[in-house]
Every structure is written in C-alpha cells, then in structure tokens.
Design a protein with these regions (language model features):
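Helicase C-terminal subdomain and adjacent C-terminal extension
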Residues: 151-215
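Conserved helicase/translocase motor-coupling segment
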Residues: 24-98
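Short glycine-/polar-rich loops that comprise or flank the Walker A/P-loop
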Residues: 35-36, 123, 138-141, 180-183
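Conserved motor-coupling elements within RecA-like helicase/translocase cores
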Residues: 110-142, 149, 161
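Conserved coupling/interface region of RecA-like P-loop/ASCE motor cores
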Residues: 1-12, 19, 88-90, 178-179, ...
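Conserved small/polar residues in nucleotide/adenosyl-binding loops
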Residues: 8, 18, 22, 212-215
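Amphipathic alpha-helical transducer elements in NTP-driven molecular machines
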Residues: 59-63, 93, 128, 166-177
C-alpha cells in the first residue's frame, strides 16, 4: 500500500514526479512508475471550448498512460484489478473512453480478430467514474484526472474538505489515494491547480523533491 500521510503527502517510500516529457519517449511512463510510487503528470493548459467539464488533452495523457500500463502488464492485465480512473466530471468519462479507443487503434490497428476484440473488451471494462460514484475496490494503478481548466472550477473540486491535525485535507484526493494499491498517477494543469493551497503544496513538493520545473 502507499505509505502516505493524507494531510502532508509525506511519502517515505514514494516520490512525486512532474515529467510531461515522459509521454514522448518509448515506455517513458513505465520507467517513471518503476521509480515513483506516486506520480504527477503536468498537462498543458487548454484554451476555451464550449465543453467546460471535459479536458481532451488530459484524456489523451490518461489514455497514453493506460496503454503503456496495458502493454507492460501483458497477459496479467485484469480490468477489475489493474487500473481504475477517477475524474470529477461525468462528461470526462466518455472523453477518456474515446481517447483510449483512439490510442488502442494507434497502437494495435483496426484489425478485427478475436484477440483484438478481447483486448478491446478489457480496456472498455476499466472502471472510470467520479469520486462520488466510484465504488471500485483497490486497483494496482489509480489514475486521478483533475480535468479542471479554469481557477473557478477549483471551487467544485475542493468543496469537500476536512481538517486533521490542523491541515486541510481534500476528500476527493483522499479517496483516490486510498484506492491505489501500488501506484497513484495524477494528471492536471499545475498553473490552475497551484491556486489551491492543498494542490499547491503537492506540486511544490514535486518540484523540491525532483528539482524539476512543472511544464
């Protein structure tokens, strides 16, 4: 299990990492996860669109992460045990599923075979849900997509917090952390997230720990 204190994200056996560039290298995500039990992948800020509760860029990052985990786990991949995805908005669920379908076609093509159908079914059966509705048990990998693109959306994202030992703790992030058996992967835009105290501490910890800038 993750050795993590909820209030401070003190990770004696874990490290936060902020490398968007790993997505552009072969097996970069897998190498990142081999070194880090908790990872934060910085996504670029998305411009204005009509769909305020979706984030296509984050969906594509999550899909790339899913496909690299899927490839690295090979025959041991279990849709009920390996990956769970948590997002704040239901609209983002379909966006992520479509991105996973597109990433699958890019990786494996459109060949119609029993093997391909079985692989697609495994990916379609991955649990993707909101924090409020997520009823899944623990997964080896939990991917938490923040989705938000504007500061005002942080009010919804952080509307459920509690105090413990004088620290404000975000319940939604806490749920994601408690569902991660081996790895917690967070995807979000640091420029927006840093405007919240809790998320700012998380990202600053990542910078100080790895001496890297958030991109």
């Amino acid at each position: 299990t993750l050795n993590t204190q909820h209030s401070t994200l003190n990770t004696q056996h874990s490290t936060l990492n902020t490398q968007h560039s790993t997505l552009n290298t072969p097996n970069g995500i897998v190498r990142m996860l081999n070194a880090h039990r908790i990872a934060f992948i910085a996504s670029p800020r998305v411009g204005n669109t009509t769909a305020m509760k979706t984030n296509q860029v984050e969906a594509e990052i999550i899909a790339a992460t899913v496909m690299q985990i899927f490839s690295s786990t090979a025959d041991s991949f279990d849709e009920a045990q390996t990956i769970g995805i948590i997002v704040p908005y239901r609209n983002q669920i379909a966006t992520i599923r479509n991105a996973i379908d597109a990433a699958y076609r890019t990786m494996f093509g459109n060949a119609d075979s029993k093997q391909n159908e079985a692989q697609r079914n495994k990916l379609h059966n991955i649990t993707i849900d909101t924090v409020e509705r997520y009823q899944g048990s623990q997964r080896d990998y939990i991917i938490y997509g923040f989705t938000v693109r504007h500061p005002y959306q942080l009010r919804f994202l952080t509307n459920n917090t509690f105090e413990e030992d004088g620290m404000r703790i975000d319940r939604k992030l806490n749920v994601a952390m408690t569902r991660a058996r081996l790895h917690l992967i967070m995807v979000g835009n640091p420029e927006v997230l840093q405007q919240d105290e809790t998320f700012s501490r998380l990202i600053n910890f990542a910078k100080q720990r790895d001496r890297k800038s958030v991109v």
